[in-house]
Amino acid sequence: MNLHEYQAKQLFARYGLPAPTGYACNTLREAEESASKIGAGPWVVKCQVHAGGRGKSGGVKVVKLKEEIRAFAEQWLGKRLVTYQTDALGQPVNQILVEVATDIAKELYLGVVVDRGTRRVVFMASTEGGVEIEKVAEETPHLIHKVALDPLTGPQPYQGRELAFKLGLSGKQVSQFSKIFMGLATLFLERDLALVEINPLVITGAGDLICLDGKLSADGNALFRQPELREMRDHSQEDEREAHATQLELNYVALDGNIGCMVNGAGLAMGTMDIVKLHGGEPANFLDVGGGATKERVTEAFKIILSDEKVKAVLVNIFGGIVRCDLIADGIIGAVSEVGVSVPVVVRLEGNNAELGAKRLADSGLNIIAATSLTDAAQQVVAAVEGK
């Protein structure tokens, strides 16, 4: 679950991280009043959306007059911002952030992630701030410095100082960076975060460190014990189908293709999408119905998949372990009948009672194609989309 920049900076302030003074505004009046609260300009106005690339799309602007703040608010509030990270429709702009402009001497990068390889929370820092860290990692990986936190001892001030020295910081900047390091580590661990990015972390003209931007992503599996973060969730920034699937405890991610995929198991779902691509198809989604592929869950999954107008066919790939494939077949038949599926449905069943399940699908009289293997399923669904 992603947070807005202004929400990230609110949390930064609680954990002692320095950030520019600013206010999130929902109306034109609030935007104008915020400038008076901050004091003399110049100011920076930023659209609040869950996407990067705002500046290149006109969603971030430095202004010197209050009239410019009002004009920016009129331009964007209630509109949609399209960036290279959004789809063609863009993301709705419901708030803008007005904050004091910062005198920037140098830009750094600081991020925190969970490294699955080392099973540690890892800090990443670089002197190449203000650009995408993925680009830095690809072109100049030696400029990224890493520190892993020991789960027993937790973050240590000396680790922050080590990173500061590697970034070329000196004097008061070392102690400032160490404080940011410790505060950010505490924030990450206490709030069950999955990702933090401060890009850029800037050195001001006076030589101080300021968190100029903030991106926070919370671990969705831990939200049950983070009520405050749950309240910060902005559903308007999420795909409606994905949000609905989350409420039903279905793992759904919308994609750009036209072949709907329904699978039990995340690994099998990724493999299914791969083989669809291999045979020339384009997946419309990732959808994992989980281990309990009941009729109710399959029905809701069909509804979500078919709410995407791009879907021209559906591939159902189920591996029956403890769950019996004949019962799953009954669920698929019931779901197809109830939902009124009008596109071809290709089903591949494997495992417990797979043959009986395939027979029930064949005898159902519905527009369901029983595949004999995963390769056959992929070929059949691609052919169905192409009208062959």
From Swiss-Prot:
The ATP-grasp domain covers 9-244
Q: Which reaction does it catalyse?
A: succinate + ATP + CoA = succinyl-CoA + ADP + phosphate; GTP + succinate + CoA = succinyl-CoA + GDP + phosphate
This protein's pathway reads: Carbohydrate metabolism; tricarboxylic acid cycle; succinate from succinyl-CoA (ligase route): step 1/1
Instruction: Provide the residue positions that the database annotates as binding ATP.
Output: K46, G53, R54, G55, E99, T102, E107
| InterPro entries from the UniProt entry | ATP-grasp, ATP-grasp_succ-CoA_synth-type, ATP_grasp_subdomain_1, Succ-CoA_synthase_bsu_CS, SUCC_ACL_C, Succ_CoA_ligase-like_bsu, Succinyl-CoA_synth-like
Fetch the NCBIfam families from UniProt: PRK00696.1 (NF001913), sucCoAbeta (TIGR01016)
Q: What is this protein called?
A: Succinate--CoA ligase [ADP-forming] subunit beta
* Species: Sodalis glossinidius (strain morsitans)
